[in-house]
């Protein structure tokens, strides 16, 4: 036990001062339970009844090894103690009694900070009951150790609690230890024996090492790779796997679309069958089911498996690798195979590649390969001689079915296939009589007379070809005009090439070529239908445009006809009066004539006589011309007398009577002349209108003076 005594006499005085100032422990002594002067909260000293720290004992002579951390100096009051000496002694004791290890952040309790929660604040506690000097000393002595308030001075220092408050849930020191131990164990596991090191030292060679670099192309991601390692990493990578999942989903959607198209076609066929059944022209058809197509169809399963939709779906769902001669259950397995090292090696050896190389390759088929595709008719077994009559009946039925095939098509063929299967079943039952059984050749199918057997450039295919399609016959060639020679023989329908003419001839009799030929004819027929529809639509459009033009021209023609009829009835419109200037000129002339015609006015009699004489001369000329025109019109008539009598007498008064009214009105204001002229035109009697055809006949010979004079009658 090491004790240091510094200036004992002042210490005693401090104790006495602490007795006096004991009641000032906690700012007004409002909370006596937290009195730092003594009692149960006697920090740094033994538990005793002297609550004011009356024991004459050095503050550093404590049983607590860490007594220097807080000590009894928390009970010290007043400013007589030398602050520097206390700080020096406090730091000295801390360095002596603390752990000998260098300070580390891992030793901090819980939160690891200098100011934790309220119960974890370290350093010398500030005694609020003491004087100002003690508080100053405690503030300057913050470098002391950290201790929990709950620890008693007599007992040993408790270890810091683990898992306390704050952000850290585990002690950082323990966590670091566990991590180091874990890494050490892993390193021990990875370290093999020296003998094993020599075996595993060489790295594994990539399975794509023997594949040429130009073959490293991923057709799913459409990416080119530069070497074997990069290609292998791409195949195992996340991007490639995600792309593969998306393409697999697209394959599923496309397969469903093909199935839906087949279902729609079958529904249309069933509707047609129902219609024929209602009309009494067809009997009930039996439905069958295809698992791959997920389809209920009319006919036999063997006929359905040869149909275009079934073969298309089968080729899509179960592709075949030509280079490796392998078939796959799903298309995604086929894609995986195309990226395998085995396939790429064979593709490089055969100088073929998926994509560009495969398109550039020209495979030429031989006679042996094409002979494999010939489909010979299956022979049926015939029962013994005892049942010759039944066999003859069966042949008759079969011939009848063959005759009906031209009309009913694939359905009759399906029935024939069913009959063939029934006959085969009957023969199986009599296998014991093999000696008496004989084989009978199947009769070749009968084609319609006008069936299509060939197509040349320029030939027209009709829109309806269902009744003109030939049946398959392995002894007859179809479409030989579609096979041309190009240093070899090419079939444009099947896109295949052959080495000799014999091979081409055999190919024209194969089932694949026959199926492609029927597909080609149907496509041409649909093209013809489309062309006909387009031509009909063009004709209809032209007719519609013509009708629209005629409808637009009809009102104009009607208006012109009405104008001509009005001109024939009477010349009520003068072209010279179309503008306002002509009307003004005529109005001035009317005023002048009205002034000349006025009688009984206040003007001089000499002027009236002159004007009257001029007017009379003009009227005489007009009457003479009207009489000539009327005579010209009346010459073809048999009775000219009744028409001549009213003509010379009546036109003169209407010209004079309305002319008197505007003369009186023209004297005060010349503006009233148009109204007067209008009244004169309206007041003209009907005989003047009857004389208008004569004026129309003589209109070409009329003088300008006469035109102005006539303006009063036909102005409006």
Curated annotation (Swiss-Prot):
Function recorded in the entry: May play a role in the process of early and late gene activation, or possibly in RNA processing, for a defined set of developmentally regulated loci.
Gene for this chain: Pep
Annotated Pro residues bias: 639-656
Biased composition (Basic residues): 707-716
Region forming the signal peptide: none
Name the record gives this protein: Zinc finger protein on ecdysone puffs
Disordered: region residues: 103-168, 182-208, 350-447, 534-716
Presence of keyword RNA-binding: no
GO cellular component: catalytic step 2 spliceosome; chromosome; nucleus; precatalytic spliceosome
Zinc fingers, C2H2-type class: 216-240, 288-310, 319-343, 489-513
Modified residues (Phosphoserine): 201, 206, 673, 684, 686
Molecular function terms, GO-annotated: DNA binding; single-stranded DNA binding; single-stranded RNA binding; zinc ion binding
GO biological process: mRNA splicing, via spliceosome; regulation of mRNA splicing, via spliceosome
Cellular compartments annotated: Nucleus; Chromosome
UniProt short sequence motif Nuclear localization signal, positions renumbered to this chain: 379-383, 544-548
Feature: compositional bias, Low complexity: 657-704
Biased composition (Basic and acidic residues): 188-203, 350-359, 386-401, 415-431, 541-551
InterPro entries reported for this sequence: CIZ1 (IPR026811), Znf-C2H2_CIZ1 (IPR056345), Znf_C2H2_sf (IPR036236), Znf_C2H2_type (IPR013087)
Native species: Drosophila melanogaster (Fruit fly)
Record key words, sorted: Chromosome, DNA-binding, Metal-binding, Nucleus, Phosphoprotein, Repeat, Zinc, Zinc-finger
Residue positions where Phosphothreonine is found in the record: 203, 692
Residue ranges with Acidic residues bias: 405-414, 432-447, 560-638
């Amino acid at each position: 036990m090491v004790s240091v005594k510094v200036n004992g006499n002042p210490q005693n005085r401090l104790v006495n001062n602490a007795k006096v100032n004991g009641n000032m422990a906690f700012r007004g002594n409002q909370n006596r339970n937290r009195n730092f002067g003594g009692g149960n909260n006697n920090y740094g000293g033994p538990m005793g009844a002297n609550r004011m720290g009356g024991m004459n004992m050095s503050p550093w002579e404590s049983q607590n090894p860490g007594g220097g951390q807080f000590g009894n100096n928390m009970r010290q009051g007043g400013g007589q103690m030398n602050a520097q000496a206390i700080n020096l002694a406090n730091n000295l004791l801390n360095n002596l009694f603390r752990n000998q290890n260098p300070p580390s952040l891992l030793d901090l309790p819980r939160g690891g900070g200098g100011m934790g929660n309220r119960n974890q604040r370290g350093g010398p506690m500030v005694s609020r009951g003491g004087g100002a000097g003690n508080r100053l000393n405690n503030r300057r002595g913050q470098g002391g150790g950290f201790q929990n308030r709950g620890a008693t001075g007599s007992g040993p220092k408790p270890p810091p609690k683990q898992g306390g408050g704050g952000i850290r849930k585990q002690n950082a020191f323990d966590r670091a230890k566990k991590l180091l131990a874990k890494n050490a164990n892993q390193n021990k596991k990875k370290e093999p024996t020296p003998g094993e090191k020599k075996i595993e030292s060489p790295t594994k060679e990539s399975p794509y090492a023997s594949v040429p670099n130009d073959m490293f192309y991923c057709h799913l991601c459409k990416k080119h790779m530069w070497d074997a390692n990069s290609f292998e990493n791409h195949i195992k990578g996340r991007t490639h796997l995600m792309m593969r999942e998306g393409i697999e989903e697209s394959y599923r959607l496309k397969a469903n679309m093909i199935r839906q198209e087949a279902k729609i076609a079958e529904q249309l066929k069933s509707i047609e069958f129902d219609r024929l059944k209602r009309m009494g022209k067809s009997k009930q058809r039996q439905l069958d089911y295809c698992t791959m197509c997920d389809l209920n169809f009319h006919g036999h399963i063997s006929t359905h498996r040869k149909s275009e939709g079934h073969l298309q779906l089968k080729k899509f769902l179960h592709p075949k690798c030509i280079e490796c001669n392998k078939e796959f259950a799903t298309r995604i397995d086929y894609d995986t195979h195309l990226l395998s090292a085995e396939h790429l090696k064979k593709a490089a050896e055969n100088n073929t590649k998926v994509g560009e190389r495969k398109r550039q390759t020209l495979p030429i088929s031989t006679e042996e390969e094409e002979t494999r595709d010939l489909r010979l008719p299956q022979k049926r077994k015939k029962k013994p001689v005892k049942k010759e009559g039944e066999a003859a009946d069966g042949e008759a039925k079969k011939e009848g079915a063959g005759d009906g095939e031209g009309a009913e098509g694939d359905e009759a063929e399906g029935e024939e296939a069913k009959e063939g299967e029934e006959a085969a079943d009957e023969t199986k039952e009599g296998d014991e009589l093999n000696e008496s059984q004989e084989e009978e050749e199947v009769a070749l199918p009968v084609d319609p007379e006008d069936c299509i057997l060939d197509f040349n450039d320029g030939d027209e295919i009709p829109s309806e070809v269902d009744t003109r399609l030939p049946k398959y016959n392995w002894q007859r060639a179809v479409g030989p005009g579609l096979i041309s020679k190009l240093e070899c023989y090419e079939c444009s329908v099947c896109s295949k090439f052959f080495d000799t003419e014999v091979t081409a001839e055999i190919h024209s009799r194969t089932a694949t070529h026959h199926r492609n030929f029927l597909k080609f004819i149907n496509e041409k027929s649909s093209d013809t239908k489309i062309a006909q529809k387009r031509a009909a639509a063009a004709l209809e459009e032209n007719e519609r445009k013509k009708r629209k033009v005629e409808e637009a021209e009809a009102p104009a023609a009607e208006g012109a006809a009405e104008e001509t009829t009005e001109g024939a009835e009477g010349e009520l419109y003068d072209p010279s009066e179309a503008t306002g200037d002509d009307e003004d000129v005529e109005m001035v002339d009317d005023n002048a004539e009205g002034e000349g015609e006025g009688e009984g006015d206040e003007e001089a009699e000499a002027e009236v006589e002159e004007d009257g004489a001029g007017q009379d001369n003009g009227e005489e000329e007009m009457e003479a011309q009207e009489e000539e025109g009327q005579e010209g019109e009346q010459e073809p008539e048999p009775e000219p007398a009744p028409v001549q009598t009213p003509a010379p007498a009546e036109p003169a008064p209407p010209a004079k009577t309305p002319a008197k009214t505007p003369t009186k009105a023209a004297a005060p204001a010349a503006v009233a002349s148009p109204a007067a002229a209008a009244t004169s035109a309206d007041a003209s009697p009907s005989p003047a209108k009857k004389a208008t055809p004569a004026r129309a006949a003589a209109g070409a010979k009329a003088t300008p003076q006469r035109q102005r004079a006539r303006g009063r009658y036909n102005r409006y």
